[in-house]
Design a protein with these regions (language model features):
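Inter-helical turn/loop segments and adjacent helix faces that build the functional surface
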Residues: 159, 189-200
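Extreme N-terminal leader/anchor segments
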Residues: 1-92, 301-307, 321-337
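Alpha-helical repeat scaffolds
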Residues: 65-68, 92-103, 127-137, 162-176, ...
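Extended non-membrane alpha-helical scaffolds
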Residues: 44, 149-159, 163
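Extended, charged low-complexity segments
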Residues: 277-337
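Amphipathic alpha-helical repeat scaffolds of TPR domains
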Residues: 67-84, 104-121, 143-154, 175-192, ...
Length: 337
């Protein structure tokens, strides 16, 4: 697979009037909802084994988490998702540290410890450099595992300069070229670049998303990246006052490029949907969001029926909206309720 373009030399755009970076809401992320969940937002993305392990972990019973990680093996997207979710448990750092003391060579323990410290750093409770050090240690223990690099990319996406984002993404992609979460993090950051006077439909994040989708295998969920890029760019435009807070009134999805992308991604989903992919609900929600905003209720209705109760905070929360209300409103409109 040829390398993606370097995309170096651009400065970053602020994401809201304060200049703060938006949190990583590429799924059910605690920080996006003050740590609260309800039946609408399932942090596990319908992963029953993860849900069981997470519940046991929160109750101080840790063997289920150890067994879960052992059996996940080198399914890298699933491993990254499961470790990220376990790392958000309140006592994950302490338990992972104890596990490492008992098994100093455990790659699972090291990865959990690293990602747990990353989560603390993202919440402002940990020195980011110390979190980076634990990720580097975990990467040495498992050189082929992209998960420690996922932790580094989560830090870079929110706290680091763009060159750190690009360099970390390159290392992660070398280990797993189709890493779903990594591509979403990269697009979220690159969507924050200024447009440089280019036309609204011509931002470079769209170019990158289409290139990555084209280079991936035909059945890869990365086919939906162009739709994700449009949502991330809308987030930036709305946060900086350059687009209406109501995405359906923004016209953001009405241009010829957006219409072509929506049609292609919906057609891809009809042919290639993967029921087993650990982050499939993120793609479903992005597609439903885009089709709703583009005024295509019949196609959106198909997605909403497929989503069922598995809504994800992003992109419904974009433009600082209540994601629950936004999801319910769009679903009711599409289904005619």
């Amino acid at each position: 697979m040829p390398p993606l373009p370097p995309l170096l030399g651009a400065r970053r755009a602020p994401t809201d009037p304060s200049g703060d970076t938006a949190p990583d809401c590429s799924g059910a992320i605690d920080g996006c909802f003050d740590g609260t969940f309800d039946d609408m937002f399932d942090a596990t993305f319908d992963d029953a084994e993860l849900r069981t392990a997470r519940t046991a972990f929160a109750q101080g019973r840790r063997q289920a988490a150890r067994s879960l990680l052992r059996h996940t093996g080198d399914d890298w997207d699933r491993r990254g998702h499961r470790l990220t979710m376990l790392a958000r448990e309140p006592y994950a750092v302490a338990w992972a540290r104890d596990w490492l003391h008992a098994e100093p060579g455990s790659a699972d323990a090291a990865a959990l410890y690293a990602l747990a410290r990353v989560q603390r750093a993202l919440r402002g409770k940990e020195d980011p450099d110390r979190a980076r050090e634990t990720c580097a240690t975990a990467a040495v223990l498992a050189p082929a595992d992209p998960t420690p690099w996922l932790g580094l990319l989560q830090l870079a996406r929110t706290l680091g300069p763009e060159r750190e984002v690009l360099g970390t993404f390159a290392e992660l992609r070398r280990r797993h070229p189709e890493h779903h979460h990594a591509h979403h993090l990269l697009l979220a950051r690159l969507a924050e670049r200024p447009s440089g006077g280019r036309a609204a439909d011509d931002h470079e994040v769209y170019d990158l998303a289409e290139l990555a989708a084209a280079e991936a295998p035909a059945d890869s969920p990365l086919a939906v990246l162009p739709v994700v890029a449009y949502a991330e760019r809308y987030r930036v435009l709305a946060a900086t006052g350059l687009a209406p807070a109501d995405p359906a009134a923004s016209g953001h999805w009405s241009g010829p490029r957006a219409r072509r992308i929506l049609r292609a991604c919906f057609d891809w989903w009809l042919e290639w949907e993967h029921d087993e992919h650990p982050r499939r609900h993120i793609d479903l929600n992005h597609l439903a969001f885009a089709l709703s905003c583009a005024g295509r209720p019949a196609e959106a209705a198909v997605l909403f029926r497929r989503i069922g109760r598995h809504a994800t905070p992003a992109p419904w929360s974009y433009a600082h909206r209540d994601p629950r209300a936004a999801f319910r409103t769009a679903r009711a409109r599409a289904l005619g309720h």
